[in-house]
C-alpha cells in the first residue's frame, strides 16, 4: 500500500526535475542560436 503523501512528494519532485531539465536544454539552444556570429 502506497503512502499518498509520499506519492505526491515523488511526483512533485519528478516534475520539478523534468521541468528544470527541459527548461535548461531549451535555454541552451536559444543561447546557441543567438550566440552564432553572423559574418
Swiss-Prot record:
GO cellular component assignments: chloroplast thylakoid membrane; photosystem I
Signal peptide: none
Record keywords, A-Z: Chloroplast, Membrane, Photosynthesis, Photosystem I, Plastid, Thylakoid, Transmembrane
Superkingdom classification of source: Eukaryota
Localisation per UniProt entry: Plastid, Chloroplast thylakoid membrane
Membrane topology recorded in Swiss-Prot or TrEMBL: Multi-pass membrane protein
Keyword field contains Plastid: yes
Pfam families membership: PSI_PSAK (PF01241)
InterPro entries (alphabetical): PSI_PsaG/PsaK, PSI_PsaG/PsaK_dom, PSI_PsaG/PsaK_pln
Gene3D superfamilies: Chlorophyll a-b binding protein like (1.10.286.40)
Gene Ontology biological process terms from the UniProt entry: photosynthesis
Annotated function: Not yet known.
PANTHER family linked to this entry: PHOTOSYSTEM I REACTION CENTER SUBUNIT V, CHLOROPLASTIC, PHOTOSYSTEM I REACTION CENTER SUBUNIT V, CHLOROPLASTIC-RELATED
The family this protein is said to belong to: Belongs to the PsaG/PsaK family.
Protein name from the UniProt record: Photosystem I reaction center subunit V
UniProt organism field: Pisum sativum (Garden pea)
Gene: PSAG
Amino acid at each position: 500500500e502506497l503512502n499518498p503523501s509520499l506519492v505526491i512528494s515523488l511526483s512533485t519532485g519528478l516534475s520539478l526535475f523534468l521541468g528544470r531539465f527541459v527548461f535548461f536544454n531549451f535555454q541552451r539552444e536559444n543561447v546557441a542560436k543567438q550566440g552564432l556570429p553572423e559574418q
